[in-house]
Amino acid sequence: MKSTVEQLSPTRVRINVEVPFTELEPDFDRAFKELAKQVRLPGFRPGKAPRKLLEARIGRGAVLEQVVNDALPSRYSEAVSTSDLKPLGQPEIEITKLEDNEELVFTAEVDIRPEITLPELESLKITVDPIEVTDEEVDAELQSLRARFGTLKGVERGVQEGDFVSIDLSATVDGNEVPEAATEGLSHEVGSGQLIDGLDEAIIGLKADESKTFTTKLVAGEYAGQDAEVTVTVKSVKERELPEPDDEFAQLASEYDTIEELRNSLVDQVRRLKSVQQAEQIRDKAIEALLEQTEVPLPEKIVQAQIDEVVHNAIHGLDHDEEKFAEQLAEQGSSREEFDAETRTEAEKAVKTQLLMDAVADKLEIQVSQNDLTERLVLMSRQYGLEPQQLIQILQQNNQLPAMFADVRRGLTIAAVVHAATVTDTDGNVIDTMEFFGPSGEQAAEDSAEESTDAAEGEAAEDADDTDK
């Protein structure tokens, strides 16, 4: 087999492949074996008919078609391997020549990972917000904790924000009742915004057994997207009484004896949350800094595939009704043109980021260990409420293990980029990135070596104990 590569663009190639028929003999053998199982000839057991008789029965063309269909994927893969290409997506294959007993010639056009010139990672400078915990933030956490231990008490006044109400609802569209909108005794926290638009504004000030009608747009059901006249009746009003923030409350709500100790723990809690947010900011800014300093050619077909997927998901729930989709966007203060522009921008950035991270990973020779994969599987299992083995089976069935592997590798790559960069806050303080991004590659290697040494020493000690016994 002979193959050559034409560079059509920085992200696309055409592979020309020539396969002499002598190399297709194993493919012919397999094809005839398969066809022999499918075709029954008098006097021969299934699978035992001679090749000449089979060919005479089904025709040479059918045999050639089977051989070519079976041969193309493997010959394409072989050409990719020998050319040291890194394809993205599926190829577009065209048979340009097929001469029986002579040769098979085909071309395969495919997007590839482009060559990317990377900046020196040590030159990257990342600046993020400092971690500051204010009294107001701690007070908000304490207030939230008090609310969890609050009690509800009935009141006879009008509804206020923060109250808990029991309500009846009914709705009509153009005078027609909407059965699915009718409900009785529905519990609702006023101001939460969890129900239909306009409800909270309508019931503010109402007392028990008072009603009000307002207009809102339905978001689901037969009349989705249409204006409805909704009538709400307040059945009861309750306010939440909060416990006093004292030592007694601290003992009730936590493991601490005093309110001061509880507040200190809330300070630590807020600081941990802000540390996570800071780590996310570091990650995002590291990627942004790399993107700003690096030219990344974009494979258009890969970008378009991402765009198509986003559009499909957006209109799938609307039965792919473009008109309804346009109306939905208009209600959100947007348009199809704006949606398409935003979708393309996001898709281009996503593809650029993936290509860039893969290029950095190759340069740094990032390796994914079994422990890295196990940690990700355990984390995902907890998120989805599955056993790790169940999750592995699902990922295998959906062919998602390679994507998970690539995602883990990119995560390790981002960590390596962060370690190489200079990371400071806006006050000029250098930030220790160890907690959220792990040890640097060098430190990780040292830790791994130490673990191996410790394990070896432990095994040696066990062997010595066994010998003594």
From Swiss-Prot:
It is found in: Cytoplasm. Residues 162-243 form the PPIase FKBP-type domain. Transmembrane segments: none annotated. Its EC number is 5.2.1.8. It catalyses: [protein]-peptidylproline (omega=180) = [protein]-peptidylproline (omega=0). Its main location: cytoplasm. It comes from the Bacteria. The keyword Chaperone applies. Keywords: Cell cycle, Cell division, Chaperone, Cytoplasm, Isomerase, Rotamase. InterPro entries: PPIase_dom_sf, PPIase_FKBP_dom, Trig_fac, Trigger_fac_C, Trigger_fac_C_sf, Trigger_fac_ribosome-bd_bac, Trigger_fac_ribosome-bd_sf, Trigger_fact/SurA_dom_sf. GO terms for molecular function: peptidyl-prolyl cis-trans isomerase activity; protein folding chaperone; ribosome binding. It is an enzyme of class 5 (isomerase). Signal peptide: none annotated. GO terms for biological process: 'de novo' cotranslational protein folding; cell division; chaperone-mediated protein folding; protein transport; protein unfolding. Consists of 3 domains; the N-terminus binds the ribosome, the middle domain has PPIase activity, while the C-terminus has intrinsic chaperone activity on its own. Belongs to the FKBP-type PPIase family. Tig subfamily. Involved in protein export. Acts as a chaperone by maintaining the newly synthesized protein in an open conformation. Functions as a peptidyl-prolyl cis-trans isomerase. This is Trigger factor. It comes from Mycolicibacterium smegmatis (strain ATCC 700084 / mc(2)155) (Mycobacterium smegmatis).
